[in-house]
UniProtKB/Swiss-Prot annotation:
It comes from Arabidopsis thaliana. This is Transcription factor MYB59. One of its GO terms (molecular function) is DNA-binding transcription factor activity. Pfam families: Myb_DNA-binding. Residues 5-57, 58-112 form the HTH myb-type domain. One of its GO terms (biological process) is cellular response to potassium ion. The lineage of its organism: Eukaryota, Viridiplantae, Streptophyta, Embryophyta, Tracheophyta. The gene is MYB59. PANTHER family: MYB TRANSCRIPTION FACTOR-RELATED-RELATED (PTHR45675), TRANSCRIPTION FACTOR MYB59 (PTHR45675:SF93). A motif (Bipartite nuclear localization signal 2) lies at residues 109-117. Residues 119-138 have a biased composition (Low complexity). SMART domains: SANT. It is found in: Nucleus. Keywords: DNA-binding, Nucleus, Repeat, Transcription, Transcription regulation. Induction: Isoform MYB59-1 is induced by jasmonate (JA), salicylic acid (SA), gibberellic acid (GA), and ethylene. Also induced by cadmium (Cd).
Length: 235
């Protein structure tokens, strides 16, 4: 002869089941759950009746969100006792162990999400702008330095370069520039002298003839003064 195993109801509780359980708990108390489940005709296990009463139907339960004081107490007790939810629940009247456990898991989930949360768009855009400005500045600096280096390699000396080298190494630094300058002048000054033109020699001969005539005239006056005076007296 086979014993037919009784099947118990599972799943969500209905409103009629909640009312029936409350009535029988008031009659027989909240200790003998197997007996309450059997005499009530709920077709539920004693464990299921107890959990339904403790977590949802007990008149002393608090409804709604936990207060900041309760949340702080949960965190402190969990740090002290760990996951002993029933023990923690006894320190929070009106709160069940299941409710406290759910709060703890929600709290840890939010904390993990905050750590993984990306940066805000404003801070991200400011960082992008600052990085682009840094890149542009480095490129500009590199371009100017490259140009300066190229000019130095080509032998070009600007005034800034000369004064900078004077400050660093003294006045001898500009010696190469000075040598180059005199070498350039020597290119223009070392030509052979040009021959004098023909008209310059003609002018010199004319001036020489005039000088000779003036000398002869003065000589004649000195030698024959009376003749000139006599002749002038006649006239």
């Amino acid at each position: 002869m086979k014993l037919v195993q009784e099947e118990y109801r599972k799943g969500p509780w209905t409103e009629q089941e909640d009312i029936l359980l409350v009535n029988f708990v008031h009659l027989f108390g909240d200790r003998r759950w197997d007996f309450v489940a059997k005499v009530s005709g709920l077709n539920r296990t004693g464990k299921s009746c107890r959990l339904r009463w403790v977590n949802y139907l007990h008149p002393g339960l608090k409804r709604g969100k936990m207060t900041p004081q309760e949340e702080r107490l949960v965190l402190e007790l969990h740090a002290k006792w760990g996951n002993r939810w029933s023990k923690i629940a006894r320190k929070l009247p009106g709160r069940t162990d299941n409710e406290i456990k759910n709060y703890w898991r929600t709290h840890m989930r939010k904390k993990a999400q905050e750590k993984k949360r990306p940066m805000s768009p404003t801070s991200s855009s400011s960082n992008c702008c600052s990085s682009s400005m840094t890149t542009t500045t480095s490129q500009d600096t590199g371009g100017s330095n490259g140009k300066m280096n190229q000019e130095c390699e080509d032998g070009y000396y600007s005034m800034d370069d000369i004064w900078r080298e004077i400050d660093q190494s003294g006045a001898n630094v500009i010696k190469p520039v000075k040598d180059n300058y005199y070498s350039e002048q020597s290119c223009y000054l070392n030509f052979p002298p040009l021959a004098s033109p023909t008209w310059e020699s003609s002018l010199e001969s004319i001036w020489n003839m005039d000088a000779d005539e003036s000398k002869m005239s003065s000589f004649a006056i000195d030698q024959f003064p009376l003749s000139f005076e006599h002749g002038s007296g006649r006239l």
